[in-house]
Amino acid sequence: MYIRTFGCQMNEYDSDKMADVLRADQGLELTDNPEDADVILFNTCSVREKAQEKVFSDLGRVQHLKKQNPNLVIGVGGCVASQEGEAIVKRAPYVDVVFGPQTLHRLPDLIKRRRAQGVSQVDISFPEIEKFDALPPPRVDGATAFVSIMEGCSKYCSFCVVPYTRGEEVSRPFDDVLLEVADLADQGVKEVTLLGQNVNAYRGAMGDSGEIADFAMLLEYVHEIPGIERIRYTTSHPKEMTQRMVDAYARLPKLVSFLHLPVQAGSDRVLAAMKRGYTALEFKSVVRRLRAARPSLTLSSDFIVGFPGETEEDFQKTMKLIEDVGFDTSFSFVYSRRPGTPAADLHDDTPQDVKLRRLQQLQALINQQAAAIAQGMIGTRQRVLVEGPSRRDPNELMGRTENNRIVNFPGVPRLIGHMVDVVVTHAHTNSLRGRVAGIERDTSGAE
């Protein structure tokens, strides 16, 4: 099987699960070459503009393979599939299966029905937690893994399609998450990333007791699982950053000193139009409390530039927020209209060249801040999880620091999958360079 993934880490996780269900049910293994595949899947993302056209363009590139091999199964999953549904088959009749993020576990049955009936199968329903109940146990090869703890979003920001493509927020049961993390730890995973559209909105049922665990409680329990040495999570929402969450940074050393906290804008007027549910001052208050609990915390964020009605004054307020807070990295884009969202109907009279100029200025400021953080790391001793050979030089190793910086350094292959101390010697634009200072034991549970 060949799977091409677009978009966020949730989609990466979903693609892994597609591979798991097809491997377990049909014995298929992954290939990097679509020409060698019996099943070709596109796991799509609808966040950016023209996502649908991108899907049909990619489908067109594999259509000839269907002509060569009529038994080939071509499928479209993800958020574009949820949005378009039957329209995908109408426009591209050679597509065999269309499925949403919540129905990927039904993929084997959809393929079987397609082969038995000779008719394209479409299932973009929202069966809530059924997806997780039907997935096979995770299989990983490496020291890091993703674990999805919830699906969907109930915030309904005016610009966002996620509530319409992934449904309302649904949390996995508390024990199910812990069992999956423990299973991954038994397979050698040392760093786990907990995933959700609004991951800190997690509210998981605790067995049959009727009690509900919040995200802070989940973090506390994951923290105690033997073998897990690092905990990350994404994506969080500022409204859900409770005091219990803030306190977790003071109590849980395995929780990394890095947080992705999307703010989107620094103007209260724009934030209100986006329906984000907080002000710039409230966002800065959250950051201040987080850094009081964990002074070493670095932040990344999301920014939308050129939202309908954004004035130059609004934009300058965003720039001021960036200057006040300081960010390590950002995902920043010019606003793109998403059909079916409330913002799609807002009047937008800002010229495109103005939007692009603002985006360039914003990215330049954050790049400047990121460079300063990188320079400040030179000479410091960083705890690094070694992930594998360096992409630049296969004779060297690559790992990540707590603040998610890639570090390349000389080392022997036996270090892969282990924590090592690395002294940073150089800072480059997108990575660091260092040398090994010492090897930590696997049994270390402290940061």
UniProtKB/Swiss-Prot annotation:
Q: Which GO terms describe its molecular function?
A: 4 iron, 4 sulfur cluster binding; metal ion binding; N6-isopentenyladenosine methylthiotransferase activity
Looking at the record, the residues that make up the MTTase N-terminal domain are: 1-116
Cofactor: binding details: Binds 2 [4Fe-4S] clusters. One cluster is coordinated with 3 cysteines and an exchangeable S-adenosyl-L-methionine.
Origin: domain of life: Bacteria
Q: According to the UniProt record, what class of enzyme is this?
A: transferase
Q: Which residues bind [4Fe-4S] cluster 2?
A: 153, 157, 160
**Which HAMAP family is this protein grouped with?**
tRNA_metthiotr_MiaB (MF_01864)
- Extract the PANTHER family matched here: CDK5 REGULATORY SUBUNIT-ASSOCIATED PROTEIN 1, MITOCHONDRIAL TRNA METHYLTHIOTRANSFERASE CDK5RAP1
Its annotated function is as follows: Catalyzes the methylthiolation of N6-(dimethylallyl)adenosine (i(6)A), leading to the formation of 2-methylthio-N6-(dimethylallyl)adenosine (ms(2)i(6)A) at position 37 in tRNAs that read codons beginning with uridine.
- What name has this protein been given in UniProt? tRNA-2-methylthio-N(6)-dimethylallyladenosine synthase
